[in-house]
UniProtKB/Swiss-Prot annotation:
This is UDP-N-acetylmuramate--L-alanine ligase. The keyword Cell cycle applies. The keyword Ligase applies. It comes from Clostridioides difficile (strain 630). One of its GO terms (cellular component) is cytoplasm. GO terms for biological process: cell division; cell wall organization; peptidoglycan biosynthetic process; regulation of cell shape. It is found in: Cytoplasm. Its EC number is 6.3.2.8. Belongs to the MurCDEF family. ATP binds at residues 109-115.
């Protein structure tokens, strides 16, 4: 079997390609830019093309897998269809792979997927269960974004964008939260809730639907779900109640869980913030229903120390801590900055790169209220990702909204100018956070360069 991946350099596509190589398939693929992920695939025997051309679809290719970002008029996709190749989108292909595993776990939600998938993977890996893992970030424990296991356990992120996760075949599904996002595809929150409801209905009756019971939209996704529903959260009506929350001197969470009247004891985390207590609680419940004993879960959850671009320490400038975070939704920004505030630094700087024009425009009001915990805010240009500039939204619009809300915010276009400004103004004991799903991390890297 010869499989070609259009957009093979993506975090999920590269992971699927690696799984196929491990299964003994011939793998080729194309992407627009070089990356370390492509180098890794080359080392494993994949044929990689830079640039997407119809000639890349050779006669011996049997199947072509493509991402949601690939346009219908893509040269390779058109050529594959003209040559009558088997064509499958990424999510459908991943769903087919999931069928091969007895215990497949899908982690979904508007935000927190990568952190929670990584937490859950850490619990399973250190329990010697040898899971196959697909994660949307760089998890040091597995040396990247994918690990090929030799067991019936499969752990993956599940994204709602373009209803991708409706192609999956999970036995356990987690929903961390349900909020407005991806409004270039969904018409609004009602359509998003309907999608998550369909996701829940994918589960078999013997499966588990583990959901954040404190989320205001969660009850609207439960209609006709056949699996066992486990709600977790701080509200006493939940099945798994999070209690006695506090933080150590480093800002790491400590909490207890009471499940169906039984005290599961105290859990200690090695990551920051209330949001990670919620993430961890879902991972704990998924591990518990998978048959992992409580003490193993308790020990292993503390081992997890984060994943790349999730409150990742990049180093220091002078004596100021420099951190990078993937936060690109208002709720994520609030959670990240709230966790940062607990570290009690002198001045909290946030350098934010908005991600996509659609998200920035549709959530402009929410973004304008997401930075209150920050003392100084720098906004740079919107990262387009898959979109074209519609001309009706600009980062300066966000800066103006922040100014109206009495947030100390400025706009700086170029990364180099941001770094120069920071070097001139950051003081000892400050905390600098770069935030966004685009390449804003480069500002942090440049700032800490010697």
């Amino acid at each position: 079997m010869n499989i070609h991946f259009i957009g093979i350099g993506g975090i999920s596509m590269s992971a699927l390609a690696e799984i196929c190589i491990n299964k003994g398939y011939q793998v080729s693929g194309s992407d627009s830019n070089e990356s370390y992920l492509l180098d890794k695939l080359r080392d494993q025997g994949a044929t990689i093309y830079i640039g997407q051309k119809k000639d890349n679809i050779s006669d011996d290719v049997n199947m072509v897998v493509y991402t949601a970002a690939v346009h219908p008029d893509n040269e390779e996709l058109v050529a594959a269809k003209e040559k009558n190749k088997l064509v499958m989108n990424r999510a459908t292909f991943l769903g087919q792979i999931m069928r091969e595993y007895k215990n497949s776990i899908a982690v979904s939600g508007t935000h927190g997927k990568t952190s929670t998938t990584s937490m859950l993977s850490t619990i399973f890996e250190y329990a010697d269960l040898d899971p196959t893992i697909l994660v949307g970030g760089n998890l040091s424990m597995i040396g990247g974004n994918v690990k090929i296991g030799n067991s019936n356990h499969f752990i993956t992120e599940a994204c709602e964008y373009v209803d991708s996760f409706l192609n999956f075949n999970p036995k356990i599904s987690i929903v961390l939260n349900v909020e407005e996002d991806h409004l270039d595809y969904f018409s609004g929150i009602d359509e998003i809730k309907a999608s998550f409801n369909k996701f829940g209905k994918l589960l078999p009756p013997e499966g588990y639907f583990i959901i954040n019971g404190d989320d205001e939209n969660i009850d609207d996704i439960l209609y006709d779900v056949k699996a066992t529903i486990i709600k977790y959260g701080r509200d006493s009506d939940n099945d798994a109640v999070i209690k006695d929350i506090h933080f150590d001197n480093s800002g790491h969470g400590i909490f207890r869980i009471e499940y169906e009247g039984r005290d599961l004891g105290e859990f200690e985390l090695s990551v920051y913030g209330l949001h990670n207590i919620y993430n961890a609680s879902s991972a704990i419940m998924a591990a518990l229903v998978s048959g992992i004993d409580l003490e193993t879960i308790r020990k292993n959850i503390k081992i997890y120390k984060g994943v790349g671009r999730r409150f990742e320490t990049k180093g220091y400038y002078k004596n100021a801590l420099v951190v990078d975070d993937y936060a690109h939704h208002p709720t994520e920004l609030k959670a990240t900055l709230a966790a940062a505030k607990k570290l009690k630094k002198s001045t909290l700087w946030c350098i934010f790169q908005p991600h996509t024009y659609t998200r920035t425009k549709s959530l402009l009001g929410e973004f304008s209220e997401a930075f209150y915990a920050a003392d100084k805010v720098i906004i740079t240009d919107i990262y387009a990702a898959r979109e074209k500039d519609p001309g009706d939204i600009h980062s300066k619009d966000l800066v103006e909204k922040l100014y109206q809300n009495n947030v100390d915010a400025i706009y700086i276009k170029e990364f180099e100018d941001i770094v120069k400004y920071l070097r001139e103004n950051v003081k000892d004991n400050d905390l600098v956070i770069t935030a966004g799903a685009g390449p804003i991390y480069k500002v942090a890297d440049l700032l800490v360069e010697k």
